[in-house]
Amino acid sequence: LRVVARTSAFAFKGKGEDVREIGQQLNVDAVLEGSFTRESDGIRITAQLNRTADGYHLWSHSYETQSKDLLAVQADVANSISAEIQRIRGGAAPAIRTPTTNPEAHDLYLQGMYQFYRHTPDSTLRAVDLFEAAIAKDPSFARAYLGIGRSEINLVSMTRLTADEGYSRAREAAQRAVDLDPNLGDAWGVLGMANYSYDWNWDRVKEQFQKALSLGAGTPTREAYGWSLATRGRFAEAHAQLRLAAEQDPMSPAPALNEFFTYNFERNVAGQRKMIAEMMRLQPDWVGGRLLHVVLSVQQKECATARSEADWAGKNYPKLPGTQAVLAFAAACEGDRPEALRRIAEMKAMGAPAYQLAIGYALIHDRDHAIEELGKSADAHEGQILYIKYDPFFDEIRSDPRYVALEKRVGLL
């Protein structure tokens, strides 16, 4: 049984699209729909299962209860629906475990997940506060610890926390989640992400990712495993994992982003263009796709395209550190060294990752400053430092003994 990720399923929320069209876009055989009504004397929940091939109504049921314990009602309904789906498919349904018995903790957790999925620095910080409040109500709430771990990793990528701060907090929270619930696959995945990005211990991390996936971890874990495989030069395995991630979450551009880097490490330009097109198809105005289009264009000396995309980012996302980075890259592509240096100075003022500064210096052929910034990236345990073995931006300085020493330092040689 394959269930698509939340982000892809929620892409259709409230849009009233035909179930057959949804089935085609998500590549699923059936769609489960539901509604919730609070009435004066209780609660009514209606669920229906429709076949996507022809819209045929497979099953429906209404659940009515006067119980005030919403968590108990949720567990009962979830187990009932799971059993019915398994009856239609054939086979026994696994019992669905209630993550907490404390209604206040559960409500705070749901608020935290809402903030988490808004994907902004401020909302992610708010999510951490809400998850911590949930834990205060129920210290055994493993999923709330998982929420903290995932949020801390995102805050590192958003440059709101240093790698040292964020990854250590993420590991601590994920380890607590695993201690409370050893079968929580995504918690093992967060351990893998934090440990690989910070400790560079591939053998241990590989086991953690594989454990996570064996327990049914979601798309972010599979993406992270695919990314880690790419940094080790295991490109075929990386592509396989990232394509599975795309099947799990077909409406998200994130798997295509990670596969772009895999193609980039392979110097496969056609593959990179394909991933750019896929990101644009899914979210035409997604800044991640636009920034990577600059990366590809600069590497291919397509400076006019790089300038156009960088200017778009500058207009729409001027405060994003990545925007200043691509503006510097585009200036370097055009041969405008003073402008590139000005943008690099702005990147530093905004607290951009040292790895991005190193790319800027490499593009203006400043070998010493590029290697100096790469050393700072390694000192800070930035996740991007694991790109150095295959990153095309550094081909010009790859043979420098100082560069080779950095590869050895982070465990890539």
List each language-model region with its residue ranges.
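Short, ordered coil/turn segments that flank beta-strands lining enzyme active or ligand-binding pockets
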Residues: 52-54, 363, 401
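TPR/TPR-like (Sel1-like) alpha-helical repeat modules
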Residues: 315, 375-382, 411
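Acidic, proline/glycine-rich low-complexity intrinsically disordered segments
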Residues: 1-319, 339, 391
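Glycine-centered helix-boundary capping/hinge motifs
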Residues: 25-27, 365, 411
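Helix-coil-helix junctions within alpha-helical repeat/solenoid scaffolds
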Residues: 284-289, 294-375
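Terminal, low-structured helical/coil segments at or just beyond the last alpha-helical repeat
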Residues: 388-413
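Right-handed beta-helix
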Residues: 379, 383-391
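Short arginine-rich
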Residues: 354, 382-384, 413
